[in-house]
Structures are given as C-alpha cells and as structure tokens.
C-alpha cells in the first residue's frame, strides 16, 4: 500500500472528502427578473411567469377573480404562496390551455410552485413537503369497447 491510514480521524476526513455534495439548486431568472415554469394537471398546461410585485395574478390576460369565479379555485392558486409565506410578494402572469377549470387551476398551482423554487431555491423543501412540486398524474381513464363508459357495463337483462 502506497498510502496507509494512521488514525480514525484521517479516515473520517477521507470519507467526507469523497462524499458527493447534495445538488445545489440555483436561481433561474431571465433578463426581466422573472422566473418561468410550466405546470400540468389532467389535460391542462399552464405557462407561468412570476416576478417580485404586489401580488397581482393574471390568467390569460384576465384577472384571477374573473377567470376563476369559484373561490375554491382561487384558493388553490394561492396555496403555494401561503405555504411559503410569500403572499402578496410576487406578481403572476400565466397562460393556461386545455382541460376544465379545476384542471387549469391545478396546472397554474403546479406552475407557480415550480417558478417559486426557481426564484427562491431555499423554498424547495417546504413546497416539496406540501406536495406542490409533484405532478398529479391522475388522468381520465379511457373508454373500453364492450362497455358503456370506462367501467360501466351496458344494462343487463336476465330474461
């Protein structure tokens, strides 16, 4: 052996030197100081830009109160900010297409969460723990032949 280890201290130093560091997430912003992310839910796809501001949310060039009339959907969109304790600190501009209103609200929430982590990487653990960064992969089950719907059978008559 060319090199021998004399004590346990040297062994622990070698271990820490060889251990790879956890991946460091960097701030990802464009020249306008905006973070961009895409969010998906069911059939809906949202393109989201966030920038520091007064908390104004615009969806498809309309106010969030106009586009998402139901309070539950607006609450869904605000969840990432409230969990990260950043309510009213960022302006959100997003375009969303496909699916229904519930899927679109979920897609916007997913996009906002991802954009927040690009803007402030230290929020990643909080949002990940809340489940905002994972893509909800549940989609509508396909219709099968020989059935009325995905699982419902045609009416059965015994005689």
UniProtKB/Swiss-Prot annotation:
<dbReference type="InterPro" id="IPR020574">
    <property type="entry name" value="Ribosomal_uS9_CS"/>
</dbReference>
<dbReference type="GO" id="GO:0003735">
    <property type="term" value="F:structural constituent of ribosome"/>
</dbReference>
<dbReference type="GO" id="GO:0022627">
    <property type="term" value="C:cytosolic small ribosomal subunit"/>
</dbReference>
<keyword id="KW-0687">Ribonucleoprotein</keyword>
<comment type="similarity">
    <text>Belongs to the universal ribosomal protein uS9 family.</text>
</comment>
<dbReference type="InterPro" id="IPR014721">
    <property type="entry name" value="Ribsml_uS5_D2-typ_fold_subgr"/>
</dbReference>
<dbReference type="InterPro" id="IPR000754">
    <property type="entry name" value="Ribosomal_uS9"/>
</dbReference>
<dbReference type="GO" id="GO:0003723">
    <property type="term" value="F:RNA binding"/>
</dbReference>
<dbReference type="InterPro" id="IPR020568">
    <property type="entry name" value="Ribosomal_Su5_D2-typ_SF"/>
</dbReference>
<protein>
    <recommendedName>
        <fullName>Small ribosomal subunit protein uS9</fullName>
    </recommendedName>
</protein>
<dbReference type="GO" id="GO:0006412">
    <property type="term" value="P:translation"/>
</dbReference>
<dbReference type="Pfam" id="PF00380">
    <property type="entry name" value="Ribosomal_S9"/>
</dbReference>
<dbReference type="InterPro" id="IPR023035">
    <property type="entry name" value="Ribosomal_uS9_bac/plastid"/>
</dbReference>
<keyword id="KW-0689">Ribosomal protein</keyword>
């Amino acid at each position: 052996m060319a090199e021998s280890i004399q004590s346990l201290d040297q062994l622990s130093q070698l271990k820490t030197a060889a251990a790879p560091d956890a991946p460091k997430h960097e701030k990802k912003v464009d020249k306008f100081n905006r973070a961009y992310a895409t969010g998906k839910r069911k059939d809906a796809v949202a393109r989201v830009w966030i920038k520091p501001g007064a908390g104004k949310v615009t969806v498809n060039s309309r106010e969030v109160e106009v586009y998402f009339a139901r309070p539950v959907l607006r609450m869904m969109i605000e969840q990432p900010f409230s969990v990260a304790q950043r309510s009213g600190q960022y302006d959100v501009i997003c375009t969303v297409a496909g699916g229904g209103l519930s899927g679109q609200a979920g897609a916007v929430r997913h996009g906002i969460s991802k954009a927040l982590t690009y803007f402030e990487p230290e929020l990643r653990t909080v949002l990940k723990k809340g489940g905002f960064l994972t893509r909800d992969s549940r989609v509508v089950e396909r219709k099968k032949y020989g059935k009325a719907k995905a699982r419902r059978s045609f009416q059965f008559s015994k005689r």
